[in-house]
Amino acid sequence: MDTGKRLVTVFGGTGNQGSSVVRSLLAHKDKLFHVRVITRDPTSEKAQACAKLGAELVKADGFNKSETVSAFMGSWGAFVNTNSDEEIYKIPGGRSDYDLGSTVLDATKEAGVKHVVYSSGLNLCKYTNGRVHSEGFESKYYVEQYGRRKGFQTFTPIVPASFMEAFLAESFCQSLGGFPWFKRDTGEYLLATPPYGGDERMPWVSVEDDFGDIVHGIFLDPDSYHLKTIQGSSELISFEKMVEDFMEVTGEKARYVRLKSWVDIPLDGTSCREEMRAIFHSMYSNGGKWFVPDESEIDTATTLKKEAKLAQGVTDGSLTAFKDWIHKQWERRLPN
């Protein structure tokens, strides 16, 4: 395996996924990776946080191909993630997330990047026979298919599981009953979901704690993961078990209620509720397969995490269980 210094350029490095990748690569004990972050605003607080960790900042707009080619020049590898929720994509007839993703991959290829890890999404429409559609998920899926045909030395799509960090957003919590931060009038926390499907265990990932390490593991041996879809998961866990773990670590009362169907998630005019309905509709239709057509597994992520932590000089390379994640978040919220 090549032992020279490797420049990895991160597109989307100021976001949750990208910043996790930046932190992990820069923590390599032998400083194997030099990290460059492409950003539209190098003066932003998030960009400066990357710089303080030791990342190089380069200004470029992903829609500007020539700028982006220059930003990727000299890179051995690239991690690419785009934000499918940008307001610009809501303009009828305007640019799309597919336009951005495909342009960025064109730029990486033109710049001579050998190894690309791309944060992909789910094709809900395809695997529900057209019953469910999500522009955000599907645009990433189609960019992935485009990337597979670009002829990179290695191209590895990683599909993130549902983010544990979603529980830090009030809109997400309230769409499922308020758990784990908003008590009911009864004095307990309520988690209410439709059936998920399969064995009811849903894949979740701690983006902060695990996602970057999983990507780090890929970059340690990219040839072994060429064209293999990586499941970016920390744990497979049922909602009922989440409530049990929450009560165990917090000592608070909580209850799980299973709704009859995805249509029982109440709408409130926000895209969050619509997306939740789409996800539960799709997952139940697919027998609980988040990574359809594949069954969910964490063996690959477990291996990649361990390899990354060893490269950082850390012997405990365990993935983050929801129980540990919620305990950490609960401790952060307690008054000093």
Curated annotation (Swiss-Prot):
GO CC terms on record?
A: nucleus
Q: What class of enzyme is it?
A: oxidoreductase
Q: Where are the transmembrane segments?
A: none
Q: Which residues bind NADP(+)?
A: 12-17, 40-44, 61-62, 82-84, 140, 163-166
Q: What is its EC number?
A: 1.-.-.-
**Use in biotechnology or industry:** Malbrancheamides have the ability to inhibit calmodulin, calmodulin-dependent phosphodiesterase (PDE1), and induce both endothelium-independent and endothelium-dependent relaxant effects, suggesting their potential as vasorelaxant agents.
Keyword terms: NADP, Oxidoreductase
* Gene3D superfamilies noted in UniProt: NAD(P)-binding Rossmann-like Domain, UDP-galactose 4-epimerase, domain 1
* GO molecular-function terms, A-Z: oxidoreductase activity
- CDD domains reported for this sequence: NmrA_like_SDR_a
What family, per the record? Belongs to the NmrA-type oxidoreductase family.
Function text:
NmrA-like family domain-containing oxidoreductase; part of the gene cluster that mediates the biosynthesis of malbrancheamide, a dichlorinated fungal indole alkaloid that belongs to a family of natural products containing a characteristic bicyclo[2.2.2]diazaoctane core. The first step of malbrancheamide biosynthesis involves coupling of L-proline and L-tryptophan by malG, a bimodular NRPS, to produce L-Pro-L-Trp aldehyde through reductive offloading.
- Protein name listed in UniProt: NmrA-like family domain-containing oxidoreductase malD
- Classification of source organism: Eukaryota, Fungi, Dikarya, Ascomycota, Pezizomycotina
